[in-house]
Amino acid sequence: MEEWRAGMLKKYIICILFWLSLIITIPAFALFKIPDTDFGVNFSEAVTYDTKSLLMKFNYKTNDLKMGPYTGTWKNRKASSKFLMFGKRKTSTEITLVHEAYGTWFMFCSGILKEFEIYGFSFDRQNEIDYQCLMRNGEKEAVLIVLPFQKPKFSMGPPVENRQVKITLPDGREIKAVSLHKTVGHKRSHPKPVGYKIVNEGKAIGGIGRLEKKNVILIGDEIADTDDAHLAFMSGLGLWFFQHNDRKSPLD
């Protein structure tokens, strides 16, 4: 009888330890409801494109793209290397985007992050730009550039990565995007962006983030029937891959 009780107690303790370890290792977003991105503007009437189909794909594999009226293919690559204290993480994405009205556009996005690691602490080394997307259709070209965030001289914990993005359109106009770090109903700012807002002359025209429980690319209703809607969509697509790739793999 005593042996049976001891055996049951052992199994009980092992079960408790298992669930405790599981709770500790599973990210918070897997256990609790994920709040929507706080865009600071009303996007309730925006056109949305669900980005779920862009997840869970193998590296180097060419994947089919189907988002609303858009079709095409995309291929995403992530690689890292390290020598002594110096490390490097590279990402690149090739996208062929086909739309009945706007034709075929080719997008190539790439980024590189250089790191210096000592005593188990990793420090990013500043680049002139962190990420760039070239978008071409014949002689038409648009360019998206993600600038490095301003690193504080001293920070307790991870700093908030406030990102500025420059987007040059084929006609020479320049629009911008800014990173978003707050979620609806919460005051705390997340270190990594939880979305981006695309802005033209101070007015939000699109973005990426979480809206109504879905991760989406957003196009403001006021530009939905204009050529700018297509350019905002491509910019959002480039930013989605930047945000997706700007996460260190647990295998690094």
Task: Describe these PLM feature segments.
Residues 6-16:
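Bacterial N-terminal signal peptides that target proteins for export
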Residues 1-5:
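Intrinsically disordered, glycine-rich low-complexity segments
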Residues 15-27:
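Bacterial N-terminal signal peptides
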Residues 30-252:
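Intrinsically disordered, low-complexity proline/glycine-rich segments
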